[in-house]
Structures are given as C-alpha cells and as structure tokens.
Amino acid sequence: MPTPSNAIEINDGSHKSGRSTRRSGSRSAHDDGLDSFSKGDSGAGASAGSSNSRFRHRKISVKQHLKIYLPNDLKHLDKDELQQREVVEIETGVEKNEEKEVHLHRILQMGSGHTKHKDYIPTPDASMTWNEYDKFYTGSFQETTSYIKFSATVEDCCGTNYNMDERDETFLNEQVNKGSSDILTEDEFEILCSSFEHAIHERQPFLSMDPESILSFEELKPTLIKSDMADFNLRNQLNHEINSHKTHFITQFDPVSQMNTRPLIQLIEKFGSKIYDYWRERKIEVNGYEIFPQLKFERPGEKEEIDPYVCFRRREVRHPRKTRRIDILNSQRLRALHQELKNAKDLALLVAKRENVSLNWINDELKIFDQRVKIKNLKRSLNISGEDDDLINHKRKRPTIVTVEQREAELRKAELKRAAAAAAAAKAKNNKRNNQLEDKSSRLTKQQQQQLLQQQQQQQQNALKTENGKQLANASSSSTSQPITSHVYVKLPSSKIPDIVLEDVDALLNSKEKNARKFVQEKMEKRKIEDADVFFNLTDDPFNPVFDMSLPKNFSTSNVPFASIASSKFQIDRSFYSSHLPEYLKGISDDIRIYDSNGRSRNKDNYNLDTKRIKKTELYDPFQENLEIHSREYPIKFRKRVGRSNIKYVDRMPNFTTSSTKSACSLMDFVDFDSIEKEQYSREGSNDTDSINVYDSKYDEFVRLYDKWKYDSPQNEYGIKFSDEPARLNQISNDTQVIRFGTMLGTKSYEQLREATIKYRRDYITRLKQKHIQHLQQQQQQQQQQQQQAQQQKQKSQNNNSNSSNSLKKLNDSLINSEAKQNSSITQKNSS
C-alpha cells in the first residue's frame, strides 16, 4: 500500500523525539531484537532485547481481549506469539502514557516481517490547496499590541453553543419570519436553541436511551424561565449596586452578538412553542444526542484510555501527603485570597459607581446648557437685555470645613496671643513703675527704700499664689469635664499602617465555645474532687439513669436533696438505664436495662414493670411530695353537631382525664355559658351593624379567661414553681436561695451607695477648696489695696513735711535778711 508523503513512519518518526538521543545503544539493540523476532531467529539481538525489556506482570483488565488456548494447542504455538509480549515493550521514543495510542499500539503488535507493506499513523492530508480560500477568508491581519486583552474564558466569548445551518435558515425565513412584522434574528434563534439544549440536558440527561420521551414545551418552560431569571437577577443586582437606571444592562463579558438581542423571556413567550417543535424533531432525529456534536472530553471517574476520540486527557498527579500544618496554611491562603477577591470586587463596584455619577453629572450639565440656550433665545425674542455670561458656569467658592481640632488650635493660638499681650503690657507697666521708684528712691531714705523692696517681694509672692490657684482650678475643671473627641478621618502613610490579620467570625465563635466548654469542664472536675466519694449528685438530667431508692426514716424528703451538705446514707436498690431514651419515651423502642445495688445486670422479666410508668420515669421526682403534672388541656370537652333545620349545637362535658381529685374545679361555677349562647344567637339573628363593646361581651371575656388559664400558670410542665428553680439549680433550699439573693442585692446596693457617697464627698471637698482659694485671693487683693493706700498717704505726708520745712527756711532766711538790713541801717545811722 503506498504511503502518503506526510505519513509518519515508525522506523524514522518514532526515533526523532527529544528522549531518543540518550538511549541510542539500547534502541539499536531493541531494533535488532525486533528484526530477530520477525525472522524467527534466536540470536544475540533477541537476548539483548529481552534483557532490556520493561515487562511487568499486570492485573488482568476487563477491557483487554485475551486469547484462550487449550492444552492441545500449546505444541502448535509459534515462537513469535510466545515472545510477542516483549515486542510491545520496545523503546518507542515517546512518553509512557502516549505509548498506548491506538495506531502506535497496533503497529508495535503487528511488527513482524510477514507483512510486506509498512503501517503508518494517519494524519490529515495537507498537500492539496483550496481554490476558494480567498472567497471565504477576506481581510488583512493586524498584529495586536499585546497578547492578552482580558481574562475571560473561551466560553464567555464564543457566544451560544448552537450554530445555525442551511436547514435552520430555511425554516427561519419560510415559517417564522415570513409575512410577520416582528422578525426573529439569527442570533436570537441560536439563543433559543441553545437554551433548549441546556434545559433538556438538565432535566433529561439520559435522553439518548429513549428519545421519544422528550418533554413538551409546557413542561420545559419553567426550567427555561428559571435559568434566565438567575442571569436576569444577577444583572439587576449589579444595576442596583452601581445606582444605574438602565433597562438594558450589558457587561463586558457579554458577546457582541447578544448586545442587540431581546431578553430570553420575551423570546420564549413569542417564538418559544413554534421553534421548540422544530428543534424537538431535530433532537429526535439524532437519537437524543446533541444536534451539533461537541468535543469528547475525559469524564471524571472514568478511564477511557482505549477511545482515541477523547481529547485533553488529564495527567495523573501524585497527591502530596497532607498534614495539619499544610491544611492550616492552605486555609489561611484561601482566606487571604477570598479577602483580596472581595476587595477587588468592592473596588470595581466603587469605580463603576464613580463613573456612573460622573456620567450623570455630564448629562445634567448638558441639559442645563440646553435650557440656558433656550432662555437666551427667549430673552432675545422678548428684547430683554442680559449679561453675556449667562451660558457660563460661574465657579463657586469651596466651603471651608473647620474640624473640631482646628477650632481648638485656633482658640489656643488666640489665648496665647492674649496672654503674650497681657504679659507685655504688665512688663511695660512694671518697668515704668520701677523707673518711677528709682527716681523717688534717689530722694528717699534707706528705711523707705527697704519698705518699698519688701512691698515688691510681697506682690510677687501674691502673684505666684494666684497663678497656682488658677492652675489648680483649671486642673479640677478639666478632670471633671469630658475630653472632646474628633471624628475627622486621618489618613496615615502606607509605611505606618499596621499589618493586621483580621480574624474570622467562625474562629472567634469556635474559640468562645471552646473556652466555655473548658470552663464548665474545669468546674465539674473541681466539684468532683471536692465531693470525692462522700457525696453524690442528683440532678434533673433526663439522660441520667433512674433509681429505686430506699430513703431513711429520719430524713425529710422535701429538703434532703436541696440541702447545702448532701447526705450519703441513701441506698440505691435498682437503677434503670436506656441507651435510646428519646425513642423509648416515644414508644418506638423498648430497650431498658436494670441494675441492682451492686451494679449487676438483672433480667427485666423478673420484675413486674409497668411500661407506662417506666416511660414517665424521667418526669418523676421521688423527693417531691404531692407531685402534680399540670396539663395545658382544656378542662371541658366540647362537641359540635348539626341538628334538624341545620341548627348547630355545642355540647360540653367535663374532662375527667385532666381534672384532679384534690382540686376539682369546673368553669361552670364562674362562666355563664347560657349568656354566651344568647349573645351569639342574638348577633346572628339581628341586622344590627353596631359592634358590642369588648368589655361587655361575654364571649370575649370567656376567651380571655381561657388564655389566662392556659398561659398564666405559676408552675412549669413538671409541677415545680418557677421561683423554686434557681434553688433547685444551685442544689440548695429555697430559703437559702432567698437569703443569698437578698444579701447579693444588699451588697450591690451598699456598693452603689458607697460609690455615690465617695463621689459626693470628692465633689464637696473640691468645692470647699475652690471657695477657700477664692477667699484667699480676695484677702490678698484687699491687702494689696490697703498697702497701696498707706503708701500714698505716707508719700503725701512726706511731701507736706518737706513743704513746711521749706517754708520755715524761707521765713528764717527772710527774717535773717531783714535783721541784717536793720543792723546795716543802724550801723549806717550810727556812723552818720
């Protein structure tokens, strides 16, 4: 048989792989062995081939065809058939998993010299040229800037899985769109057929077994609508999250062919039944398989190694041995990946919201500009003169946002400025005063200078004291006042943001539950160690065994189990235990075990046990006297019957099963049923539309009484008062529980009173200190004023004294001058 030029021969092509260069020697030996096997000789090549073979005994497979030989056929077997297993294990130059390819396996098995022609692996013929290539493939190729445009899968981009052919086109043009205004496009036709394929594959995955049993359109319609509603709801959710108001919402991953198509629900309502009948006929023609065959992939769990049409086989990867540390690392990575994906989704939604807001803002600006243009034209038509800047958006000043911290900083700066100005004024005043004092001190005596220095020192000390008092007052006021909190967001740089790993809610809840269990377990172990073998615990746990106990005569049965120190003198005669207690109480199971006081198992047939009594053993308390089980059943039974002329009668009878012998009561004593019946009949027979008052209605009173009796019971299901349950839980008497609760309330109230009194004393002491500081400040101010007044009076008296001494001196001088003049005049007279 002639081989084509592009056929791959086993002698050449199989030895040109990447792994053939390393084992050329062994391969040549195998080739020699192959020749020797084909000729039937037993030379050195055969021994080399057999020594290097990789034959290994394998398990017999169900899919492998084995030839059965009889004992008579063993002597007639050919040597080639006996050594055929070694021929398969020749080094082929390909990988181990690819050696089982059908054509290669067939060539290796038939690798004998009896056949004259050479087998080859068939490949499609590519030597011929197609003359109509330019007719179907037009256009010029443009090389892209990058290889990856987006990360969508092939299924997201290829569109529908159904492709129209000529038969579908004729049906669409002649039977669907002929003579109708509402035309169905080819893309919409493919979408409908593809949705039919998906729905049938979901509802009838094994349709190929019985193609005639395909569902009708009405039966398949809910599945079609449900599959479309999932996608439609997802689009609506995205549309709502980004605050968009578009009716036709399209994502980036939608194919181009579906951008202008109508929704699937509309197509199903208008064209679904007609197109489904046509598609159903085509589905039956192909025996329930796909109308357009798809690639055959490897199914999970099935090994189709023989089928040559299975593409993309999986590699068998050896799974690594998992440890707890690897599981923890994987879970942490998955949590981190989940958080990153969530953050990416949130960022994408925020970006979409921002772009949507900017788009709406641009559209609003365009509308405003159009309205301004219309107003401008209207003004011109009405000869109204206006400004030329009507069509321009005037920039508005941004409102300055002042935070709490900025306001506090501004107030502090203003206070500092005021304090600095006051200090500068005080300093200037002091300098002026010092200069005046220096001028005066040059005229004063030493004693006056010392007095002035002492006054200055006292003023400085008083000023220091006042400043200290102000600081104490400010400190007390700041301690009493609450700090001002700032709610302004402070953005930290990326280098200062701590890398904190957020914990999951599940992990926190699990740790909380573990801690609670550990706390309870430790408490139980501690209690068990304290009790040791002296005391035993009697609780109301329904899964504990029930005891038949012999009680001592001198003990009271009402207080013994709840005493603070339990007695150990009780003797357990028998104990009953059931491994399936809920089933036993329901009557499903009758498994019960009986043990004596020594712990030995006894046969329950020896004891005359009442099954009804045993089923209620878990509700029985041997330590409570006069046990009563309060039921929620109504104490009176009613029966409704219809008599002659369709008259309805209600018969009543006391419920003797629920009534107690000790407290036998009936509602007949305090409920007037006759008045209730009269009221009902009067309402039915009369045409009065006025409603009866609720408090005057006997029927409403009866209903309220029934509800009160049903729910307002002071006892629980087992006949124990709710007020006694805390004492029972703490295993103490009710009086002890009342004393404990009262002491607890007393201690709490005493602590609250003590805290309140301490707080009041602190406030009172701070107020007294403030008053004392204010009183001292007032005294210091009064002393300063008195000292200033005394200094002024002294200065005035000194000035008066100096003036009087000067006047005396002048008088003396004038007297002396007058006397001198008189003497001179006398001397002149005497001389004359």
Swiss-Prot record:
KW Nucleus (keyword) present: yes
Signal peptide location: none
Keywords of the record: Cell cycle, DNA damage, DNA repair, Nucleus, Transcription, Transcription regulation
Subcellular location: Nucleus
One protein family per Pfam: EPL1
Cellular component terms (Gene Ontology): NuA4 histone acetyltransferase complex; nucleosome; nucleus; piccolo histone acetyltransferase complex
Assigned protein family: Belongs to the enhancer of polycomb family.
Protein task: Component of the NuA4 histone acetyltransferase complex which is involved in transcriptional activation of selected genes principally by acetylation of nucleosomal histone H4 and H2A. The NuA4 complex is also involved in DNA repair. Involved in gene silencing by neighboring heterochromatin, blockage of the silencing spreading along the chromosome, and required for cell cycle progression through G2/M.
Protein known as: Enhancer of polycomb-like protein 1
